[in-house]
Amino acid sequence: GSLITAMRTGAVAALSIQYLRTSSAREYAFMGLGNTARATLLCLMAVLEGPLNIRLLSYKGQELEFMKRFKEYSRLNFSIFENVEDLITGADVVVSCVTVAHGQFASDTCFKSGVLVVPVHTRGFQNCDLFFDQIFADDVAHVEGFKYFNQFKQFDEFARILLKQNPGRTSDQERILAYNIG
């Protein structure tokens, strides 16, 4: 994809994070560390203040290139994780920009109370569809074909939060999934 597509997608993901994270979110996990993840972090820094703890999934040296790209930003603190379950466990926000997934990324128990998961390319989080408290997407048409769509506990389009027609997160205990497909 183009840089414009990556930036647009990153901006939408950052907006979802800004509106749906818990009030105390500090740990941001990233997997799939290409242009979309980089754009998401750039946009996130524009809308969030203070230091950010950024967890990166180790994969083919991409985590080192990612950290190198952001080395001049002193408010970013990086840590590297060797496997997905460790990356997700304890994270307040999980951003996935991976383009290929074979099965689920992590068991249900890895997703702590209050977590926000933003699977930009939708893959690998099907188990979350069944137990997360709220699920948002840019457009119902993007997700209505999902295997478990009819079993979502609570679903709405993200735009309704921006229009103040849906409060979004109503407690810091809710697990929320935000599908940003574009």
Positions of predicted regions on the chain:
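Rossmann-like adenosine-cofactor binding region
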Residues: 76-150
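NAD(P)-binding Rossmann-fold cofactor-contacting core
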Residues: 47-71
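Glycine-rich adenosine-cofactor-binding loop
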Residues: 13, 21-44, 58-61
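A glycine-rich, Thr/Ser-enriched phosphate-binding loop motif common to dinucleotide/cofactor-binding enzymes
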Residues: 1-17
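Short helix-loop-beta connector
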Residues: 20-27, 49-50, 112
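Adenosine-phosphate binding glycine-rich loop
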Residues: 129-182
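A structural signal for isolated positions on well-ordered beta-strands in alpha/beta enzyme cores
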Residues: 29, 53-55, 79
